[in-house]
Amino acid sequence: MASRFLAGLAALTLASAAFAGGPEQAGSLLVYPCYDNTRGMDTFITVTNTNLDVDNGTTKVEFVYIDGSNCLEFNRTRTLTPGDTLTVKSKTDNPNSTKGYVYVFAKNKTTGAASSFNHLIGTCRISNGGSGSDLEIQPFVYKAAGADGANTDADSDGIRDLNGAEYEQSADQLFIPRFVAQGPATSELIMINLTGGSKFTATVDLLIWNDNEEVFSSQYSFDCWEKKELSYISGAFTQSFLESTNHATGESMNGAETGL
């Protein structure tokens, strides 16, 4: 899979640039930012075929699980009939991996080749049995560039290229509209290196605004996939740092600083 990194807050759906893949559309490739098979956690991955054509609406889909620790992949292929919805439990579907991300792409129902089938939507639900909390995360959805039914692997390299020729490009900038200062709150950022996986280190440039439109910069480097607390990524996300800035004293959230 070739593109730039994706990043997303665990409790927030992110929209990409207008030309890039995003959550509010049907497409041929769905990227689910996180699955969690650790003790007490359950992840349910759903994909729906919105094509209702009884003659031409059937497609195969391949689930590709990417282990977050080493970027090794595990694959399963299913068939979706017109209007069909499939939900899998990642702990059962891929029991030998703890955490990571998964992508699902359409394949020709006869040849098994990756194909244009811009009718797939999905969602992911992560349940914490210990706390009783549920988290719903929407996948990043990418439309295929070719006509319906056309093979998408234009360069025959076996990789789902997010280059505009096979699938939509991915944005190189993402805006997260609000975060709550770490200390009073705990938030996590999911980062995926879609360009090279574990083959090289990806560096994310961060611009962090306080609630008075002051901006601070930071960087974070990672390999493959990471899900980290904001305070671990940069001290600029913490309550103590934001209180030390020229922040707007009347714009806190129940005493907690906020930012963009």
Where are these regions (language model features)?
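Sec-dependent, cleavable N-terminal signal peptides
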Residues: M1-G22
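Gly/Pro-rich, tryptophan- and cysteine-flecked surface segments typical
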Residues: F19-L260
